[in-house]
């Protein structure tokens, strides 16, 4: 059985992320979406909200589960008995950064990283940009899964 980890903060998860999860799920027997937290950073959504949003957005992926973690991604990967990381790439800038991380992860832990080119329709989408546009009153419904869009609107209107 082969398994891979899709790590990130996912604050919130976007349709670009879901696209990467779908493609990873098609290639690996098991996929773990790892929400890695940084205690020094305060996100818009707490950990439980992020887990719920990803679970609600990926019900169609039976070989995917969501877990939380801290520390090095490679430690998370190895502790689950997996040997691969899957990362989506939007731009050349993403590639430059992720390539260095991939090489370090291979060096320190023997963990391989597989890059997935983001679908062109999501190449400009980021969690930060979606939040910023939504905060300014813009429509981000084509950038976020419906459960996420709903929760974001509720949070911004003070109902969450």
From Swiss-Prot:
Ligand binding (ATP): 9-10, 17, 88-90, 98, 122-128
Cofactor(s) named in the record: Mg(2+)
SUPFAM superfamilies: Nucleotidylyl transferase
Single biological process term from Gene Ontology: coenzyme A biosynthetic process
Range of residues in the leader sequence: none
Site residues, Transition state stabilizer: 17
Location of the protein in the cell: Cytoplasm
Highest taxon of the lineage: Bacteria
Gene Ontology MF term list: ATP binding; pantetheine-phosphate adenylyltransferase activity
Residues holding substrate: 9, 41, 73, 87
Known EC number: 2.7.7.3
Keyword Disulfide bond found: no
Alphabetical keyword list: ATP-binding, Coenzyme A biosynthesis, Cytoplasm, Magnesium, Nucleotide-binding, Nucleotidyltransferase, Transferase
Catalytic activity as recorded in UniProt: (R)-4'-phosphopantetheine + ATP + H(+) = 3'-dephospho-CoA + diphosphate
Main location: cytoplasm
Annotated Gene3D superfamilies: HUPs
CDD domains for this protein: PPAT
One GO cellular component term: cytoplasm
Protein family according to the UniProt entry: Belongs to the bacterial CoaD family.
Subunit text: Homohexamer.
Alphabetized NCBIfam families for the sequence: coaD_prev_kdtB (TIGR01510), cyt_tran_rel (TIGR00125)
Name of the molecule in the record: Phosphopantetheine adenylyltransferase
Source organism of this protein record: Mycolicibacterium paratuberculosis (strain ATCC BAA-968 / K-10)
Lineage, broadest ranks: Bacteria, Bacillati, Actinomycetota, Actinomycetes, Mycobacteriales
Gene: coaD
């Amino acid at each position: 059985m082969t398994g891979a980890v899709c790590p990130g903060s996912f604050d919130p998860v976007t349709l670009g992320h879901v696209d990467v999860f779908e493609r990873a799920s098609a290639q690996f027997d098991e996929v773990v979406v790892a929400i890695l937290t940084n205690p020094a950073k305060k996100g818009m959504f707490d950990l439980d909200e992020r887990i719920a949003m990803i679970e609600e957005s990926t019900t169609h992926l039976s070989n995917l589960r969501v877990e939380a973690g801290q520390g090095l991604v490679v430690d998370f990967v190895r502790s689950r008995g997996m040997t691969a990381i899957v990362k989506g790439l939007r731009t050349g800038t993403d590639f430059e950064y992720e390539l260095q991380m991939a090489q370090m992860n291979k060096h320190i832990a023997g963990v391989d990283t597989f890059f997935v080119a983001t679908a062109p329709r999501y190449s400009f989408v980021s969690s930060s940009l979606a939040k910023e546009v939504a905060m300014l009153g813009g429509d981000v419904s084509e950038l976020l899964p419906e459960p996420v869009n709903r929760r974001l609107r509720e949070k911004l209107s003070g109902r969450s």
